[in-house]
Amino acid sequence: MNKIIKFHNERIKWLWILTAILAISFFVICFNNVKWIYTENTAKYELLTSSLEKIVKFYSFSLVDKPFARGVPNSIDVFSRAIIGVAFGLGFVGTMLIDYFIISKVAYIVKQKIKQSKKVGM
């Protein structure tokens, strides 16, 4: 029983570590374009915090007629990577939680069986 619980705790610890690594890499992929850009309409430099912010600015609010015609493929690529990252992250966390509940249930059943066998032995 203790071996099962020890294995279970060790496995959950590594799954949380992998989930944290996945989340950090997702943010690095999505928010890696922190740089200063020059905007022609306001004639000043602005800090562009992320590619996703650029997509939201140009597509949601339609600030310009042709949203950076040369940069459209890059924006679509970043957006698709973000969607893939979110889907992969949710799938990974979901799998981890399902695994956690299954192993918890198995450990609980084994614990109950051990208690029953001790009562019968007495």
From Swiss-Prot:
Segments spanning the bilayer are 14-34, 83-103
Please tell me one Gene Ontology term that the record gives under cellular component. Answer: plasma membrane
Q: Where in the cell is it found?
A: Cell membrane
Q: Which UniProt keywords apply?
A: Cell membrane, Membrane, Transmembrane, Transmembrane helix
Q: Does the keyword Transmembrane apply?
A: yes
Membrane topology field? Multi-pass membrane protein
- From which domain of life does this come? Bacteria
Q: What is this protein called?
A: Uncharacterized protein UU165.2
Organism of provenance: Ureaplasma parvum serovar 3 (strain ATCC 700970)
